[in-house]
Design a protein with these regions (language model features):
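Intrinsically disordered, low-complexity terminal regions
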Residues: 5-7, 12-109
Length: 109
C-alpha cells in the first residue's frame, strides 16, 4: 500500500472503506475515522473527536513507524471496522485526546 501524509487537519470519514496503506494526519480529525475500513493504518497526531463504536481498543504503544518516520507517542491503538470484519488500525495520539482516557479501563481486564 501507499502512504498519504496530511500536514493539516481533516474532516470526517478519513480512510472510509480503506483496504490497505497508511494515512498520517498531523492535525485534527472531525471524527468517524476508518468507517468501513478493512485494512491499513491511520495515524492521527491531533484530536480525533470520538472513535466509532465498531472499533476496539487493543493497547497503548510508545511509538508508531509510518513510512521512514518513527513518531514518539504514546498512541492508543484501535482495531476495526469490526462491522466489516476489518483489521484496520487507528493510532491516536494520547496527549491530544484526553476524552479517550476512559477507554483505558478496557485495557486492564
Amino acid at each position: 500500500g501507499g502512504l498519504i501524509i496530511v500536514d493539516g487537519s481533516v474532516g470526517q470519514f478519513v480512510g472510509y472503506g480503506m483496504r490497505g496503506g497508511d494515512i498520517l494526519v498531523r492535525g485534527n480529525s472531525s471524527g468517524r475515522l476508518g468507517a468501513s475500513m478493512k485494512g491499513g493504518r491511520i495515524v492521527v497526531l491531533g484530536n480525533c473527536g470520538s472513535i466509532l463504536p465498531s472499533f476496539t481498543i487493543l493497547e497503548i504503544r510508545p511509538t508508531v513507524r509510518i513510512g521512514e518516520e518513527r513518531i514518539k507517542g504514546p498512541f492508543y491503538l484501535f482495531q476495526g471496522d469490526l462491522n466489516e470484519g476489518g483489521s484496520g488500525r487507528l493510532f491516536i495520539a494520547k496527549a491530544s485526546n484526553p476524552q479517550l482516557i476512559a477507554l483505558e479501563r478496557y485495557l486492564e481486564a
